[in-house]
Amino acid sequence: MINISFPDGSVKQFAQNITAFEIVNAISMSLAKAAIVVEINGELKDLSTVIENDCKLRILTAQDYECLEIIRHDAAHLTAEAVKELFPETQVTIGPAIENGYYYDFARDKPFSIDDLANIEAKMQELSKKNEKITRELWDRDKAVEFFLSIGEHYKAKIIASIPEGEPITLYRQGNFIDLCRGPHSPSTGFVKHFKLMKVAGAYWRGNSRNEMLQRIYGTAWATKEQLDNYLFMLEEAEKRDHRKIGKELDLFHFQEEAQGMVFWHDKGWSIYNTIEQYIRKKIRKNGYIEVKTPVLVDKSLWEASGHWAKFRCDMFTLETDDKTLALKPMNCPCHVQIFKQGIKSYRDLPLRMSEFGLCHRNEASGALHGLMRVRSLVQDDAHIFCAEEQITDETVRFCKLLTEVYKDFGFTDIKVKFSDRSEICAGNDEVWDKAENALKTAIEKAGFIYTLNPGEAAFYGPKIEFVLTDAIGRQWQCGTLQMDFVLPERLDANYIAASGEKKRPVMLHRAILGSLERFIGILIEEYAGKFPIWLAPVQVAIATITNDLNDYALEVQKTLIDNGVRTDINISPDKINYKIREFSNQKIPIIAVIGKQEQANKQVTIRKLGTIEQEILSIEQLIAMIKKENSNYL
């Protein structure tokens, strides 16, 4: 007999060499029908797994988040099975689960059409309803290669040949389809019910551009219809909010081939950019930061000394001049260390909080560029805190408080925190890492955050905190970071004089709240759907006249507003007032000020806020006071 321990603490005895399914069925027949996989001693396994020894066992159903990846992997196999039935000449390659779905790569001469996708999805529904049993098979390596070659699946044969000797070759069979896979999988195709094929794209075999191009079918799959519907609605809403689309409609920015990944900021977009920079500058000054400016072009010798040349060389733009190699900086940190090193620093100078809106360049692959979200030229709200070890906790708490205030001002209150601890390869000794990790954990808790652990995901030079925002339609964006660094001060010989009189290395905290301003503006455009709050809107007040004889008064009002720092637009054309209001509303201007004869006579305007039909009559002074009050909360 073997002892099986369950999550509730109970222990049950079963005969040796029993399958996981038999155990589940013995507990509950209804649970056996719902079970997808089991977790045995922390590892996910098929229900067909034979259990020979005592173990801890957890039964997972569609209600457990771990099963979502299983369902998506099942859906990838279902897609491949459907493609092989409809297009038997097609070769299958790989099909993993990914975030929000899966993909499968196919080798086929003729491209898949939109109609083909619809037919494949219909065939998948048919195969799902058949509820074909999914079984795991262990094959001899040579036999597996011979089998796949015999059915014309040359890519599968190549994959098997690349698997290290000694590793088992496992295949999964469902109906007439068989695929190479590690698993685990659901017991049958009937567990895959809620899915949709999304698109077809090109993909190189093995991700290498020197290899042949394959066709990649992307799909999404979920545990329930409600989850699928919610996801599809989110995608539809995201398309409406796409910052590239809104950016064009509101005349904020553009890109062009002659400067790939570089933003052409238009007047209105640049207004948003400068307002955010002004806001952040005010915040950091209040929090004791100094602001600096460092060179954009720096000799490669500094990047070699810092270690960035070895790691980021391929992502850096370089040029040769006067027999020297210069690089456009991809980040600001080595330059900030150079400022820290100017003059002798004492423990009394710490913590030194050094900020910069630093212009950085990164040679991103052209295929990775995506509007404002992924660019080659970017400015970060970057700062580095040089401090003593005993100051780490207080500085981290202080930063977390500042970050929370900033996110709240932009409308983000759902903040998730991820903590990355040391990997197997790390600089420094365990004692230093223990202190650093404990200091950051204590600080996160003091700041009121609950964090999830990313085991082993820290950089080699220190532990890291990541801050993830959730937007209006449920998407998550990693923006803020705090990265502890023991290595760079050592590499670049930064030190300070401690109270004891000895030289010590400062700890360096790399921190950002927004990340890159370009990306954060892209996030804000989509968060607000272009409807910026008054303080941030590129045009705060739009003036519209009812008749042409009011134009002089309207221009006088505009001048008064501009003189008082109000960002203003005006339409004194002969167009109808309803047309003017509609046009300004389409431009998502937060306040429209209408001027008629009565408003002129009383030195007033009638305002209407975006998204409402309510009107309010204000004097020019009252309107200015309202805007200034709104601005003063942030600027």
UniProtKB/Swiss-Prot annotation:
This is Threonine--tRNA ligase. GO terms for biological process: threonyl-tRNA aminoacylation. Residues 1-61 form the TGS domain. Belongs to the class-II aminoacyl-tRNA synthetase family. It comes from Rickettsia prowazekii (strain Madrid E). It is an enzyme of class 6 (ligase). One of its GO terms (cellular component) is cytoplasm. Its EC number is 6.1.1.3. Homodimer. Disulfide bonds: none annotated. It catalyses: tRNA(Thr) + L-threonine + ATP = L-threonyl-tRNA(Thr) + AMP + diphosphate + H(+). Residues 242-533 are annotated as: Catalytic.
